[in-house]
């Protein structure tokens, strides 16, 4: 670099001196002798060079200055940097054979060729200066001379370095003389030319314009050589030579070596550009472009304006607004009035185009320019239309669909309904085929769940003709608001199939997204139609003659199924069942129910006793035979049940309708939470109100069409099939208890307390009847639930609930009908506690609606409550002291979990009587949590977690709410918080339970033994039975609703589904204390939803902090009931636990606006009922998680 710097300085001096010397020398001839001497035998070249130099000295003087300076720099570089040897141009193909030999140490091979190259270089330099100095002849001479010149050139270079300016004349002559030899194109990169000054001078002297041209030719030769090394640089350099004058142009010139950049840079400053670093960096053509730009005369503003005025079409229209208007024209082409001009301007941008623009501007009227306008304008306009219209459409469509689906998911995905929807989409063809086979009753299925609007209209007409009053559409309209997920499914028409219980059941699967509207309408219709159904039920005994068939036959009868249609459906069910149990169930029970039922059906298969009951065909046939064997002439009890239902319907049809509105709102709130069963329970809320009315008769004979009516009403949503089958199977056994049940139902219709007692009493018979079956079912359901729980927390909940729902569906269907009748009567009793319990029950139904499977489980839970009623009485007493069940919670839901297990197995039945008998209010509060726990937990957590969840809530209920209405409601949320730990049950179906149990142990240590109890295991185990039975005794009836909703939680965590009522709220509260986060999270989300009432949310959270505050869902619902009693909606929110605890409260508010107050009242009553049925709730926690 020092050499480069020195060379740069010397080059500056030399450039100035050489410019003067060249001018003075005029002729290179004088110097040529010196060059010849210096070259030592360059005589030929000097002779050639002088002649050429003489020819064009004037021209060369200018070029010579540049070339000489370049060569001086090269010489300096060569001498000082022999190794660097022409880093710039000289670095190329042997610029100076000397330099290559010396500096670069280039192989001798290059020396001769390099000499030629050097000649060419020098010529290139000159040529760049427009000096055609060297010819091929000169190059040849130079080649001959260079071998001798190399040492002389080195000497000359050294002398030049020492003499500096004094050498200039000699150098000039030498350069001129050697110009032929040195004209090698690399000299064009003279910056780096390492050729001796003598050679450079000779070349410069000799270079003429013609010579430069020849040099260019030589440069081509050099280019060939450069291809070896430097030609790439020299090739660039020939153009760069113009820029070479830039002193700092080294970097700009492509120098393979950085050795000569400075010398190359020095010559470049001579370029007009001054320092050519920038110019050199740019391509020489660019510089020419700059020159052209500079050459372009820019008119003054005034002149330009004048010119513009002369061409208004160009400038005013186009040029003046060149950027804006023209751009628009360019983009839009033909959009603007000045489109033609704009097109022209667009085509002609820049000074050249502007120049050309004048002519085209005259031709501007030629809009016919196909290139400019027609093509662009047409394409652009069409594209714009397409883009503007098409893009927004897909986006909007996607957004709308996404919003719809998102809402559906928000509401339904929390429950099995989304999966059920998938099932519906999978089974709609089957459903349609069933509809073709089964009559218009299945038309809603034909229409597909998306719409039961189209088919529902026809169905609506049929239903109106048959049993459903026009009120269905009105109710449905109210419910459609409740059902945010699928408004179309919410259509009253969809609900109108409620009269067609099978259609409702089938539709239940379809309406999973819209569980509450269908269920609400179905409930009202069930209430109103209960009498009609009972009246038609006289027809049912024929269909009821089929026993189990009657279980779903009542649905058909209710759905205007005549005995032939029922028989046909039964046959179809049998055939389909033979083909596919799920398909058969869907077909026979209801095309719509098929989807939800399919969802439920696979889990029911796990519960073999109920798996067949789940499949309507098996239920109809097998249970018909079984019931005929077990119950004997139970079809008569079915008619008795219908008579009871008539009484109850007449008595509580208003109450039931109120409960329905309440439950509908609650269900709609919980629509989001449970999936399959919840949807069914949307109807089931109302249906369960009727179901309470009907279940009074239902327990008498589930297989009777009463169970089907109540079950299908519950199942009008997807859960119908499970509950119908379960209800029929369980109620067949219940029919043995039927007298008892009828009495209890009648008494319950009359008084709430009697209803509780009857529920307990009836539940005991249920327990007795169902316990063996439940034990078997528990084994299957436990195995299934265990596997299902292992498979997925939510899926397990759904599957387990499906099985549980199937088992408990029948049992709980009857029990629920009993319990719910009781609940309704409690509500009628207008007890605040009972009303709160009913509200709790209502949220559960909402959950049940959301999850059809949950509904089935709820039904199962109801049955379980009946069976476990006595044990639950002890828990019920514990519920009276909420702390005690929480103490059991130290076992982490032991009390609740056993109930859940009991729900899965016969134990549930055992728990139910106890809970019912013990304290309907406390039990109801307790039940709310167990309900959720049993539904979601039991499937999700093998038993321990769900039990803990249930226990935690129930203890809270017991501890918090001796007064089920207010205290229970306040405690409900703490229970939910306490219950949150239960959520882990869903996370780990079996294993999580222990951790969950541990968490629950913290809230309540009273049930530590049940901590290990898995929801399924505990059913078989008596462990959860006794401890949790008391807690869940009252909850059992409520569980029928919410559990049905929660039964289908496809989510691994049924927590959201289970949270339908206070139970979910409790879980929400539990999460803080919960050892398992996932379950807690699920509960958290569901409790908010589960808390339809705002008050419920506030009380729940504070009490969740209370370790013992984990009141069972019943407690939460009891408090909610109190709130609900004051404000129907508030308890509903609390009672409606959803996967998102927050959503339910919001939904309740939404429901309020659309006449939800009524539904809220119903929900409150149901909460009271649920509180009255703690056994189911206690069981539900196991099912939940």
Swiss-Prot record:
Location comes to:
Cytoplasm, Cytoskeleton; Cytoplasm, Cytoskeleton, Spindle
Q: Where is the composition biased (Polar residues)?
A: 179-196, 867-881, 908-936, 989-999, 1016-1026, 1054-1066, 1100-1111
Q: Does the keyword Cytoplasm apply?
A: yes
Region annotation Microtubule-binding: where it falls in the sequence: 745-977
Q: Region (Disordered) spans which residues?
A: 146-196, 856-1035, 1054-1114
Q: Which residues carry this modification: Phosphotyrosine?
A: 450
**Keywords, alphabetical:** Cytoplasm, Cytoskeleton, Microtubule, Phosphoprotein
Phosphothreonine modification sites are 721
Q: Which GO terms describe its cellular component?
A: cytoplasm; microtubule; microtubule associated complex; midbody; spindle
Is Cell cycle one of the keywords UniProt gives this record? no
According to the UniProt record, list the residues that bear Phosphoserine.
Answer: 354, 448, 709-710, 712, 728, 874, 1075, 1086, 1121
Q: Where is the composition biased (Low complexity)?
A: 146-159, 856-866, 940-952, 1003-1015
- Offer one example of a GO biological process linked to this entry: centrosome cycle
Q: What does this protein do?
A: May play an important role in the regulation of microtubule assembly and interaction.
The miscellaneous annotation reads: Phosphorylation of various serine residues may play a regulatory role. The basic domain contains numerous sequences that match known consensus sequences of several different protein kinases.
Protein name, entry field: 205 kDa microtubule-associated protein
Q: Organism source for this protein?
A: Drosophila melanogaster
Give the lineage. Answer: Eukaryota, Metazoa, Ecdysozoa, Arthropoda, Hexapoda
């Amino acid at each position: 670099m020092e050499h480069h710097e020195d060379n740069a300085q010397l080059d500056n001096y030399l450039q100035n001196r050489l410019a003067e010397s060249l001018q003075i020398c005029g002729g290179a001839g004088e110097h040529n002798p010196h060059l010849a001497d210096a070259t030592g035998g360059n005589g030929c070249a000097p002779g050639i060079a002088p002649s050429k130099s003489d020819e064009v000295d004037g021209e060369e003087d200018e070029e010579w200055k540049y070339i000489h300076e370049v060569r001086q720099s090269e010489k300096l570089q060569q001498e000082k940097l022999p190794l660097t040897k022409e880093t710039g141009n000289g670095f190329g193909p042997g610029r100076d054979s000397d330099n290559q030999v010396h500096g670069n140490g280039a192989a001798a091979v290059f020396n001769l060729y390099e000499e030629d190259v050097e000649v060419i270089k020098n010529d290139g330099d000159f040529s760049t200066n427009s000096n055609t100095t060297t010819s091929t002849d000169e190059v040849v001479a130079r080649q001959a001379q260079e071998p001798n010149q190399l040492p002389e050139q080195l000497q000359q270079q050294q002398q030049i370095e020492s003499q500096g300016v004094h050498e200039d004349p000699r150098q000039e002559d030498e350069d001129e003389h050697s110009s032929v030899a040195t004209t090698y194109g690399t000299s064009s990169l003279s910056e780096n030319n390492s050729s001796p000054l003598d050679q450079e001078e000779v070349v410069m002297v000799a270079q003429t314009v013609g010579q430069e041209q020849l040099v260019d030719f030589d440069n081509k030769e050099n280019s060939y050589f450069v291809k070896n090394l430097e030609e790439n640089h020299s090739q660039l350099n020939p153009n760069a030579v113009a820029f070479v004058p830039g002193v700092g142009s080294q970097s700009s010139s492509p120098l393979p070596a950085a050795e000569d950049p400075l010398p190359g840079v020095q010559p470049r400053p001579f370029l007009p550009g001054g320092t050519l670093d920038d110019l050199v960096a740019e391509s020489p053509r660019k510089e020419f472009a700059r020159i052209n730009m500079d050459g372009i005369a820019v008119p003054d503003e005034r002149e330009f304006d004048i010119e513009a005025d002369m061409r208004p079409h160009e400038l005013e229209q186009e040029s003046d607004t060149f950027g804006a208007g023209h751009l628009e024209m360019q983009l839009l082409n033909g959009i603007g009035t000045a489109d033609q001009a704009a097109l022209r301007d667009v085509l002609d941008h820049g000074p050249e185009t502007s120049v050309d623009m004048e002519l085209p501007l005259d031709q501007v009227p030629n809009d016919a320019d196909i290139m400019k306008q027609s093509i662009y304008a047409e394409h652009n306009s069409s594209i714009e239309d397409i883009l503007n219209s098409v893009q927004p459409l897909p986006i909007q469509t996607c957004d709308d669909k996404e919003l719809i689906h998102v809402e559906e998911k928000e509401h339904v995905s929390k429950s099995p309904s989304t999966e059920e929807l998938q099932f519906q989409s999978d089974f709609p063809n089957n459903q349609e085929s069933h509809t073709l086979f089964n009559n218009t009753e299945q038309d809603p299925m034909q229409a597909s769940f998306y719409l039961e609007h189209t088919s529902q209209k026809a169905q609506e007409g049929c239903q109106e003709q048959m049993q459903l009053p026009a009120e269905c559409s009105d109710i449905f309209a109210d419910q459609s608001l409740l059902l945010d997920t699928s408004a179309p499914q919410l259509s009253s028409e969809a609900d109108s199939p409620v009269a067609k219980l099978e259609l409702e059941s089938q539709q239940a699967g379809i309406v999973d997204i819209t569980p509450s509207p269908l269920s609400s309408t179905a409930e009202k219709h069930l209430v109103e139609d209960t009498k009609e159904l009972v009246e038609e039920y006289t027809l049912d005994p024929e269909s009821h003659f089929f026993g189990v068939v009657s279980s779903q036959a009542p649905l058909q009868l209710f759905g205007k199924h005549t005995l032939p249609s029922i028989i046909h459906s039964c046959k179809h069910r049998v055939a389909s069942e033979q083909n596919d149990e799920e398909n058969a169930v869907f077909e026979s029970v209801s095309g719509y129910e098929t989807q939800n039922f399919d969802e439920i059906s696979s889990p029911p298969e796990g519960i073999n006793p109920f798996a067949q009951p789940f499949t309507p065909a098996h239920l109809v046939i097998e249970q018909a035979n079984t019931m005929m064997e077990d119950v004997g002439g139970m079809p008569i009890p079915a008619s008795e049940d219908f008579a009871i239902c008539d009484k109850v319907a007449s008595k509580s049809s208003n109450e039931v309708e109120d409960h329905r509105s309440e439950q509908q709102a609650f269900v709609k709130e919980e629509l989001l939470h449970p999936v399959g069963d919840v949807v069914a329970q949307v109807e089931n809320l109302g249906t369960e109100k009727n179901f309470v009315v009907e279940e009074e008769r239902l327990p008498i004979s589930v297989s009777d069409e009463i169970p089907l009516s109540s079950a299908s009403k519950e199942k009008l949503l997807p859960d119908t099939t499970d509950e119908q089958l379960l209800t029929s199977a369980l109620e067949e056994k219940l029919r043995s208890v039927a007298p008892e049940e009828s009495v209890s139902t009648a008494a319950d219709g009359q008084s709430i307390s009697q209803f509780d007692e009857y529920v307990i009493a009836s539940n005991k018979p249920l327990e007795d009847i169902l316990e063996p079956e439940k034990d078997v079912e528990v084994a299957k359901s436990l195995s299934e639930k265990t596997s299902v729980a292992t498979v997925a927390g939510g899926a397990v909940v759904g599957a387990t609930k499906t099985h549980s729902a199937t088992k408990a569906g029948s049992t709980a269907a009857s029990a629920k009908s009993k319990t719910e009748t009781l609940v309704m009567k409690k509500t009628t009793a207008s007890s605040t506690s009972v009303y709160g319990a009913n509200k709790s029950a209502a949220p559960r139904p909402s959950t049940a609606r959301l999850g059809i499977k949950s509904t089935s489980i709820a039904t199962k839970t109801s049955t379980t409550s009946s069976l476990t009623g006595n044990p639950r009485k002890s828990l019920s007493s514990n519920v009276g002291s909420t702390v005690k069940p929480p103490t059991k919670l130290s076992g982490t839901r032991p009390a609740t979990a056993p109930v859940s297990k009991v729900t899965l197995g016969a134990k549930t039945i055992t728990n139910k009587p106890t809970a019912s008998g013990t304290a309907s209010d406390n039990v109801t509060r307790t039940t709310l949590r167990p309900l959720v726990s049993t539904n979601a937990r039991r499937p999700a957590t093998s038993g321990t977690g769900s039990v803990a969840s249930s226990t935690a809530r129930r203890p809270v209920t017991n501890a918090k709410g001796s007064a089920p209405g207010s205290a229970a409601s306040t405690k409900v949320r703490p229970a939910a918080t306490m219950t949150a730990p239960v959520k882990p049950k869903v996370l780990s179906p079996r294993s999580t339970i222990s951790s969950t149990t541990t968490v629950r142990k913290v809230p309540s240590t009273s049930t530590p033994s049940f901590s290990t109890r898995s929801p399924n295991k505990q059913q078989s185990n008596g462990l959860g039975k006794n401890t949790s039975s008391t807690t869940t005794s009252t909850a059992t009836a409520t569980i029928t609703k919410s559990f049905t909703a929660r039964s289908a939680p496809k989510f691994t965590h049924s927590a959201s589904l289970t949270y339908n009522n206070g139970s979910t709220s409790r879980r929400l509260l539990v999460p803080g204390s919960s050892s398992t986060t996932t379950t807690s999270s699920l509960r958290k989300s569901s409790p908010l939803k589960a808390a339809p009432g705002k008050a419920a949310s506030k009380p729940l959270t504070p009490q969740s902090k209370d370790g013992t505050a984990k009141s069972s869902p019943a407690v939460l619902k009891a408090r909610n009931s109190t709130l609900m009693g004051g404000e129907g909606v508030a308890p509903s929110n609390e009672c409606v636990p959803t996967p998102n605890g927050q959503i339910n409260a919001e939904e309740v508010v939404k429901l309020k606006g659309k006449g939800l107050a009524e539904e809220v009242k119903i929900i409150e009553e149901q909460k009271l009922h649920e509180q009255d049925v703690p056994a189911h709730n206690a069981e539900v926690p196991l099912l939940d998680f």
